[in-house]
Amino acid sequence: MARVKGGLGAKKRHNRTLKLAKGYRGARSKQYRVAKQSVMRALTSSYAGRKERKRQFRQLWIARINAAARLNGLSYSQFMHGLKLANVDLNRKVLADMAVTDAAGFAKLVEVAKSKLA
């Protein structure tokens, strides 16, 4: 009985994996078995990276807000608490953008937070 090697389906599967592995060094981009492992690991890492990116941006926003708030005489936690008491519903992304691009507007927000804390 003749050996069945997988035919067109296997070829398509191999080509799909090798296409994803394009740009990898050495056997990782040439040999299917090695490429499959590398691609699997890369896809796992990219999935985790998409989750991690959200955490990293939140950390960045908090660091920027903290730095700008301290320039105006408040810590990050006091500033956020003051905004909450003043019913100011701006998220951290917007606050961080304000801290970088609109220092005067951010200073007014700090004054609002200070007035509610006092």
Swiss-Prot record:
Write down the InterPro entries for this protein, in alphabetical order. Ribosomal_bL20, RIBOSOMAL_L20_CS, Ribosomal_protein_bL20_C
* Gene3D superfamilies, per the entry: 6.10.160.10, Ribosomal protein L20
PROSITE patterns referenced in this protein's UniProt entry, alphabetically: RIBOSOMAL_L20
Coiled-coil positions are none
Q: Listed GO molecular functions?
A: rRNA binding; structural constituent of ribosome
One Pfam family named in its UniProt record: Ribosomal_L20
Please provide the record's keywords in A-Z order. Answer: Ribonucleoprotein, Ribosomal protein, RNA-binding, rRNA-binding
**One of this protein's GO BP terms?**
ribosomal large subunit assembly
What would be one Gene Ontology cellular-component term for the protein? ribonucleoprotein complex
Q: What does this protein do?
A: Binds directly to 23S ribosomal RNA and is necessary for the in vitro assembly process of the 50S ribosomal subunit. It is not involved in the protein synthesizing functions of that subunit.
Instruction: Identify the NCBIfam families for this entry.
Output: rplT_bact (TIGR01032)
The text of the family note is:
Belongs to the bacterial ribosomal protein bL20 family.
Q: What's the protein here called?
A: Large ribosomal subunit protein bL20
Native species: Agathobacter rectalis (strain ATCC 33656 / DSM 3377 / JCM 17463 / KCTC 5835 / VPI 0990)
Designated gene of the protein: rplT
